[in-house]
From Swiss-Prot:
Keywords: Cytoplasm, Methyltransferase, S-adenosyl-L-methionine, Transferase. InterPro entries: SAM-dependent_MTases_sf, Thiopur_S-MeTfrase_Se/Te_detox, Thiopurine_S-MeTrfase, TPMT. This is Thiopurine S-methyltransferase. GO terms for biological process: methylation; response to metal ion. The keyword Cytoplasm applies. It comes from Xanthomonas axonopodis pv. citri (strain 306). SUPFAM superfamilies: S-adenosyl-L-methionine-dependent methyltransferases (SSF53335). S-adenosyl-L-methionine binds at residues 10, 45, 66, 123. GO terms for molecular function: thiopurine S-methyltransferase activity. It catalyses: S-adenosyl-L-methionine + a thiopurine = S-adenosyl-L-homocysteine + a thiopurine S-methylether. The gene is tpm. It is found in: Cytoplasm. Belongs to the class I-like SAM-binding methyltransferase superfamily. TPMT family. One of its GO terms (cellular component) is cytoplasm.
Length: 218
């Protein structure tokens, strides 16, 4: 899997992973992080998720990172926003009100870009990556987040042998293996969602759950 894979998905409109509404699990559990309203929230591999609008509505500043220029322009166009733009080493920045999206490679982020992010919302990034890329992703993104940063991580769990990702299965054992050295990890919820995801059942998946974790940087 490389950058062209995701760029092509957006160009061809193969974006079944995009949700047409704010994720209810975000609305249910976000306040468990107990963040000040002015906190800056990182949303890696953000696509054009409506969750960013909801986070902004909570008084937060939002920093999305997205590889696809098409996803970024669609996000602002569909909201009727005309972002200001400038370029840095991280990529092209699109800014409208409290929302900023960097169109660039999340694996090339510099620590200075993340220095004032006091929270991270990861619904679509970790599960989008195959196992061999996850440690690199943590080293590129999570390791560079400031001490005491908090996060909400949402994963999927299913028998990986029954379906090729993405999205990939990331179970609790793997979450703890990735994060425990530097983060306190607390599972807030785990629920069966196979009945709500017919495309997984249609592909032969026999069990599907989603899990929500609260993260606290040590």
């Amino acid at each position: 899997m490389d950058t062209n894979f995701w760029l092509e998905r957006w160009q061809l409109g193969h974006t079944g992973f995009h949700q047409q509404e704010v994720l209810p699990l975000l609305q249910k559990h976000w306040h468990a992080l107990d963040l000040p309203k002015e906190s800056r929230v990182l949303v890696p591999l953000c696509g054009k998720t409506l969750d960013m609008h909801w986070l902004a509505s909570q008084g937060h500043r939002v920093l999305g990172v997205e590889l696809s220029p098409l996803a970024v322009t669609q996000f602002f166009d569909e909201a009727g926003l005309q972002p200001q733009r400038h370029t840095s080493a991280a990529g092209e920045h699109f800014i409208a009100g409290p929302i900023e999206i960097i169109c660039g490679d999340a694996f090339a982020l510099d620590a200075s870009v993340l220095a004032d992010c006091t929270a991270v919302y990861d619904r679509a990034a970790l599960v989008a990556l195959p196992a061999e890329l996850r440690q690199r992703y943590l080293q590129t993104v999570y390791v560079q987040l400031p001490t005491h940063c908090r996060g909400l991580l949402i994963t999927l769990e299913y028998p990986q042998a029954e379906k090729a990702g993405p999205p990939f299965s990331v179970d609790a054992t793997h979450v703890h293996a990735l994060f425990d050295a530097a983060w306190q990890v607390d599972q807030l919820e785990r629920r069966d969602i196979l009945d709500q995801e017919p495309r997984f059942r249609d592909e032969g998946v026999t069990g599907l759950s989603t899990a929500v974790y609260r993260l606290q940087r040590r």
